[in-house]
From Swiss-Prot:
It comes from Homo sapiens. Solcar repeats lie at residues 1-80, 93-206, 215-302. It is a multi-pass membrane protein. Induction: Down-regulated in hepatocarcinoma. This is Solute carrier family 25 member 47. It comes from the Eukaryota. Keywords: Membrane, Mitochondrion, Mitochondrion inner membrane, Mitochondrion outer membrane, Repeat, Transmembrane, Transmembrane helix, Transport.
Length: 308
């Protein structure tokens, strides 16, 4: 049931967090936006509510699978550790047990998330590159006058969508191309998911009413939201490096590896570059993980009620 509960929680989290993800992507790829609220107002004015949910179908499928694997792996790993150490899978785990299980959960995710992360980053950076190319074509020395009947040539997009992007990367760069930046992804998800599950467990223990082993719904909301924020706080530096490595595609590559990317980025842009997107990620993480954990706990309680 942990796999099913994790999948349902993941889908609910996507439904809540996808609008902010859309805003984040548009801010990163469209220079016309001066800030978060400017992007929100413009998107709603032009496209209404559905504009915030464009392209939702693929993330729902992938996130539900990844969330299912994450929660399922965490619970099964924790049960095995408790069985080996205490002789009972339902024994109360220590913080070290929770940390180790959370880390294992994060590492297992990498195999599933790396290809989709590569496709997402390539498509986002492709959009930005196309916009820059259009501006150069319109303002350069060879720009076509406004009244010219023949429009300036605009490069065709290399990737036509997520699946086409995955197929193209696999064909041109091999299967290793689909796992580009996976070293940074391992470092990001390993310790961030250890933080995620440990902070959730500790906060649940603090917020549980006297005489109860689990918190009530408000307690789960607070614990889940705070766990998400703390996880993203420690994940953001490696998330920046991961994105830069994955965007560094075929041809003239800028980075030779994880360490070179980190050193080059910090030298050119300062240490603050490692925390780009931190505020928006944390703002999104709180409501998303509130919903994820409430849905997860609700499904588990429902299952226990049906089985007893």
């Amino acid at each position: 049931m942990d796999f099913v509960a994790g999948a349902i929680g993941g889908v609910c989290g996507v439904a809540v967090g996808y609008p902010l993800d859309t805003v984040k992507v548009r801010i990163q790829t469209e220079p016309k936006y001066t800030g978060i609220w400017h992007c929100v107002r413009d998107t709603y004015h032009r496209e209404r509510v559905w504009g915030f949910y464009r392209g939702l179908s693929l993330p729902v499928c992938t996130v539900s699978l990844v969330s299912s694997v994450s929660f399922g792996t965490y619970r099964h790993c924790l049960a095995h550790i408790c069985r080996l150490r205490y002789g009972n899978p339902d024994a109360k785990p220590t913080k070290a047990d929770i940390t180790l299980s959370g880390c294992a959960s994060g590492l297992v995710r990498v195999f599933l998330t790396s290809p989709t992360e590569v496709a997402k980053v390539r498509l986002q950076t492709q959009t930005q590159a196309q916009k820059q190319q259009r501006r150069l074509s319109a303002s350069g020395p060879l720009a076509v006058p406004p009244m010219c009947p023949v429009p300036p040539a605009c490069p065709e997009p290399k990737y036509r969508g997520p699946l086409h992007c995955l197929a193209t990367v696999a064909r041109e760069e091999g299967l290793c191309g689909l796992y580009k930046g996976s070293s940074a992804l391992v470092l990001r998800d390993g310790h961030s998911f250890a933080t995620y599950f440990l902070s959730y467990a500790v906060l649940c223990e603090w917020l549980s009413p006297a005489g109860h082993s689990r918190p009530d719904v408000p307690g789960v909301l607070v614990a889940g939201g705070c766990a998400g924020v703390l996880a993203w706080a420690v994940a953001t530096p490696m998330d920046v490096i991961k994105s830069r490595l994955q965007a560094d595609g075929q041809g003239q590559r800028r980075y030779r590896g994880l360490l070179h990317c980190m050193v080059t980025s910090v030298r050119e842009e300062g240490p603050r570059v490692l925390f780009k997107g931190l505020v928006l990620n944390c703002c999104r993480a709180f409501p998303v993980n509130m919903v994820v954990f409430v849905a997860y706990e609700a499904v588990l309680r429902l299952a226990r009620g049906l089985l007893t």
